[in-house]
Structures are given as C-alpha cells and as structure tokens.
Amino acid sequence: MIVTIDGVAASGKSSVASGVARALGVPYVSSGLLYRAATLLALEADLPLDDPTTLLPQLHAHPLRLEALPEGNRVWAGERELTAELHSTRVDQGVSAVAALPEVRAWVDAQLRALPAPFVAEGRDMGTHVFPHADAKFYLTASPRVRAERRAQERPEDVPTIEAALIERDRRDRLQSAPAPDAHVIDTGPLALEDVIGVILAALPARSA
C-alpha cells in the first residue's frame, strides 16, 4: 500500500504524513527533505542553484541518505545530520529552483521508487508523477496567511515576511503543485492536525485501513 500526500508549501504535509504513517504503522517518506538537502549542499558550496552540471557532482561527492521513520525523517550527508538545517529561510528560497531541475528530480525519484511498500510518501508531485498508481492520494491546501501563521510558530520570523515568501513560492511551484485528478483535496485551514489525519484515515480504501 502506498499513500501519497501532496500540497502547497507549509500546508502541513510533513506533520500529516507522519501522523498517518504512525496510525498505519508504516514508514513515512519525505521527498522534500531530499530536495532541501541538495539545496543546502549547493548553497554551502556557493554553487548556482539552476545548474545541474555543478550540482549533481556535489551530490555524488556528498551522498545523501534519507532515514525514513514513522515519526519523521532524518537526512544525512555521510556522518553529518542535516535535518535541523533544512527549513531555514535561505533553503526555503532556493529549493524551488533545485526541485525544478529534471536531473535532480530524476535523482530523487529513483531513490523514492526503490523503496519497498508499504509507506506514506509526502512531497510535491508524489501522486501525479512519482507514484501515479498509489492506492490513495491526498492534496493539502490552505491560504498563504494561515500557512504563514503556522510557520511563524516554528521560526523567529514575522508573519508578513513568511507570507510574502510563501506567495512567491506558490507562484514558482504552480505547475508542480497541482493535485492529481483522483486526489482527495483537503483545506487544512479550519482543521486541527488530528482532524486532517482523521479525514485521511477515514478516506483510505478498506483493504489498507
């Protein structure tokens, strides 16, 4: 069984996917962390974010490893854990450019498709491109203001600044963030985390519940 959870930036994908995975007792996989880790490595090496000819060699020189756990994901570059550094503003601002590179997307997709089911996969285009035949697909959305207010609780930045960055991120990600035709679309704005998880669990096919 494969469950995909897509959605716009800061819509709660990671928290929801982790909760669903825990409820089902299966691993949780975050594709976005791999893109963020690639972005961080490029920034630290002062590489252009839109040039795969320099970025891919950097990824091969510092192989990334995604540790998929029901309670969350950890990302490693060798013996160095990157997880705590992957949600900084500079990574937020650069990850769309890296994720738009076909070469990088192919690299991430290959790692994800090699994983054995069952699992809950969270990230952009999980249900449309990476796992189009997933057993169940969900797409999370919320207004930029709601998402900014939530993210402001996680980092020392003001809501208007975060909201402006999210609006720009939405603009850049528009093509990648469209829901699959057969996805369940959920507005997480008026819902608490546990409510969103409950909606998803209730909508799963009976054989995978």
UniProtKB/Swiss-Prot annotation:
UniProt cross-references to Pfam families, sorted A to Z: Cytidylate_kin (PF02224)
Keyword terms, alphabetized: ATP-binding, Cytoplasm, Kinase, Nucleotide-binding, Transferase
MF terms (GO), sorted A to Z: ATP binding; CMP kinase activity; dCMP kinase activity
Gene Ontology, cellular component aspect: cytoplasm
GO BP annotations listed: pyrimidine nucleotide metabolic process
The protein's enzyme class: transferase
Highest taxon of source: Bacteria
EC number: 2.7.4.25
Main location: cytoplasm
Keyword Magnesium: no
Binding, ATP: G7, V8, A9, A10, S11, G12, K13, S14, S15
Reaction(s) this enzyme catalyzes, per UniProt: CMP + ATP = CDP + ADP; dCMP + ATP = dCDP + ADP
Subcellular location: Cytoplasm
Kinase keyword on record: yes
Family: Belongs to the cytidylate kinase family. Type 1 subfamily.
NCBIfam families: cmk
Protein name: Cytidylate kinase
Species annotation: Deinococcus geothermalis (strain DSM 11300 / CIP 105573 / AG-3a)
Gene: cmk
